[in-house]
Amino acid sequence: MSKRRRKVLPKEPVRCEIETLSHDGRGIARADGKTQFVDGALPGETVMAKMVRTRSRFDELRTTEVLEAAPDRQQPPCEFADLCGGCSLQHMSADAQIRFKENTLREHFAHFGGIEPEQWVAPMRSPDSLGYRRKARLGVRYVKARESVLVGFREKRNSFLTDIDRCVVLDPRIGERIEPLRELLHGMAAFDRIAQVEVACGDDTAAMVFRNMDDLVPDDREKLIAFGQAHDLHIYLQPKGPDTVHRIWPESGGRDDERLTYRMDEFDLTMAFHPMDFTQVNAGINRNMVHRAVEWLDVQPGERVLDLFCGLGNFTLPLARKGGQVVGVEGDDAMVVRGRENARLNDLSNVEFHGADLHGDFTGQSWAKEGFDKILIDPPRSGAEEICKYLTAFGANRIVYVSCNPATLARDAGVMVRNGYRLVQAGVMDMFPHTTHVESIALFERSAD
């Protein structure tokens, strides 16, 4: 059987007239009856672009020259922006990025839910568009042909790692240490046996978790410790699964000691987390997001509040500070433990945490048989369609939905509206500047009978 012959791509760039943007931030043009998706192009622009992939119904191209620039174009703040997949919109002005995200949410509400909020709220802008990212997973790869180690994000639409020596969107405690990190790894005996580096930052401490596929020789451990000392970083190893993560610098006093923290001063809370725990990447947006969610729910003393997909208590504990009785439910048992730890740390007794598979049947659990006045829901990208069908049984008169996927928010909003709730307010939050990621928040209220 003969192999399918790969199509030969044109070597010369082609001229593209950009009409609009796709939801993944690429410019859309049309030629010879086919759609063209053009990386690095903006609506209204004329660009020259090189073909990188062709399909029967569309082509994928990369901008090589801008002939006529749009007013929304800006000089990317990062020299690696054209190639690195960590960001996709650095060539677009901040105002245009916000408009793009608002339009994406509007289109999804119309397409998937067939609804629109009674009021669009002003977008929540990130206090910082650079140096904001406190968590990331950095790939590590030894390139034999170059005899060097690369550390960073994948190239755009490619499995190769980008050759970078710094990152301007990462917290500077990490982003300014990419080159020293590369030098460290290149000098280790295990230079080709470190798969990735997880990075996490609290308010006062930054950490790196090295995924070592083999046991490290003593000299490599000493080099990692010296790196942590020199750059004021906590250093962890992960020889196998997540349960094997342990700190080697500073010396650990036990797993309870291996915590980073962030403050929420508005609520007089200190939140502790392990470097591998899920936390919001943008501290400024997180503070404003929690403030808005608490404000919208308007919890009164004595009210019962349910926080679904509660994690380590990022919303749960601020809600408890308002005097209600708060129940947090989470599918990850480790995060349930973390939520309880944080409640004790902050001396809160009007809150409880439960573990449950929120994508399965949880109706038999004791907490699910009780009524609630207010509900907060912050699901993963897959959303919470089945839960939304059940929410009316809790009897809540107000629900705040925090979303990291506009498509599933719109779908779930449609379910809630059909089950007797009004979509009162909604808006976007710029949790990830310079990317197409759309974080949003919506308020639902029970319709009058």
Curated annotation (Swiss-Prot):
The active site is at residue 404. GO terms for biological process: rRNA base methylation. It comes from the Bacteria. It catalyses: uridine(1939) in 23S rRNA + S-adenosyl-L-methionine = 5-methyluridine(1939) in 23S rRNA + S-adenosyl-L-homocysteine + H(+). InterPro entries: 23S_rRNA_MeTrfase_RlmD (IPR001566), MeTrfase_TrmA_AS (IPR030390), MeTrfase_TrmA_CS (IPR030391), NA-bd_OB-fold (IPR012340), SAM-dependent_MTases_sf (IPR029063), TRAM_dom (IPR002792), U5_MeTrfase_fam (IPR010280). Residues 7-65 form the TRAM domain. Coiled coil: none annotated. Its EC number is 2.1.1.190. S-adenosyl-L-methionine binds at residues 280, 309, 314, 330, 357, 378. Keywords: 4Fe-4S, Iron, Iron-sulfur, Metal-binding, Methyltransferase, rRNA processing, S-adenosyl-L-methionine, Transferase. GO terms for molecular function: 4 iron, 4 sulfur cluster binding; iron ion binding; RNA binding; rRNA (uridine-C5-)-methyltransferase activity. [4Fe-4S] cluster binds at residues 78, 84, 87, 167. Gene3D superfamilies: 2.40.50.1070, Nucleic acid-binding proteins (2.40.50.140), Vaccinia Virus protein VP39 (3.40.50.150). PROSITE patterns: SAM_MT_RNA_M5U, TRAM, TRMA_1, TRMA_2. Belongs to the class I-like SAM-binding methyltransferase superfamily. RNA M5U methyltransferase family. RlmD subfamily. HAMAP family: 23SrRNA_methyltr_RlmD. Catalyzes the formation of 5-methyl-uridine at position 1939 (m5U1939) in 23S rRNA. This is 23S rRNA (uracil(1939)-C(5))-methyltransferase RlmD.
